[in-house]
Amino acid sequence: IIIALVILAVSLPFVFLVYQKYKPYYTAGDFGITTVVSEVDANQNGIDDYQDILLGARMDADNHPTYDGRYWSAGYPPDDIGVCTDVIWRAFKNAGYNLRAMVDNDILISNEEDYHIDYPDSNIDFRRVGNLQVFFSKYAQSLTLDIYDISEWQPGDIVVFNGKHIGIISDRRNRDGIPYVIHNSGQPLREEDVLEKRAKIDPISGHFRWNALELEDIVVYWEE
């Protein structure tokens, strides 16, 4: 009996993980929700910005970088290393934007107190959740924090949890229409049905949508 219980205890997490990975998911169309399409295609690849941001986040999720928040003197960590904020700049890179440069520029023209930092550091400022929340609060569209207003949550949106964690909204939804989140807190599945659960622990402090049409003066495009 003891051996059986041990085997059960060991196998349950694996079974749960497999279930989470392969359980059915839904899309906006299943709930009569029209998916918002950006009018901008910054990198001119034939895919609108919101879809590009989503796909960039998903590529990072599929790459499954090891969770490691150490400081990198070059600013950008290697592709196989990352934290939650790295999902965001990588998603923006896939859409053609240099999020690091935009954050750096805004810190330089703003009061440092706005960003709650003692001094600018280009190598890390764009990798801090608090700084990204300040930046998006200033320049992105601020949207509902009500997760049950499901039509207002769209693929490529940015969600911030209590100023401590950040992710990208997926195009996948659970049976109640609540969208999945693409994020990195070191968990096995990087695209998961976690919005409602996480919001109960860390209340949502920001929900944003990027619209470069309104931001010509601050946009910096990615250059290889």
PLM feature spans:
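...with weaker cross-activation on analogous glycine-rich loops/strands in unrelated enzymes
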Residues: 47, 108-187
